[in-house]
């Protein structure tokens, strides 16, 4: 339990760091709501970016995936096994390697949640069934909790960070 609380605190710290470092206004709270999209608009736009990411992943299409990620050395992919890959180029190389085997993401959209943590930052969390396997080996499927930090850029919503954690109790509630 203590470990879960510690991890939750770490995750919140990262989100708050992202909200001030990735937002175009340095994290400042706007003086008025003008120019800030509504929660329903934000949710629709973030869901659309997430759908493009999933489609690109399942098609093993680097051009689609790269278009929805923030192209930065600060991009991080915290993987299921505990490793972290830092940097856009490094993450894209890791995806391309993983795609040589079995690789499929099946988001469970009935539990998808999105929250805005700043005017230009949103977090999407959803369970997924993650299937992977080395080339020539039978694939395995495990339930994971997928989390992404999305930032609003001039080109639209992009993913700045991915967090994949085990979700052994998925489907038990």
Please tell me what each predicted stretch does.
Residues 9-19:
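Bacterial N-terminal signal peptides
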Residues 102, 130-140, 168:
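Short, cysteine-centered beta-strand-loop-beta hairpins and adjacent loop/turn segments enriched
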Residues 24-28, 143-171:
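Short beta-strand edge/turn micro-motifs at domain boundaries
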Residues 120-130:
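A short hydrophobic beta-strand element
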Residues 1-10:
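Bacterial N-terminal signal peptides that target proteins for export
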Residues 114-122, 150-156:
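A short, structured loop/turn motif at beta-sheet edges
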Residues 44, 62-117, 141:
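A solvent-exposed, acidic/Ser-Thr-rich amphipathic alpha-helical stretch
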Residues 22-68, 173:
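Short, low-complexity N-terminal intrinsically disordered segments enriched in polar/charged residues
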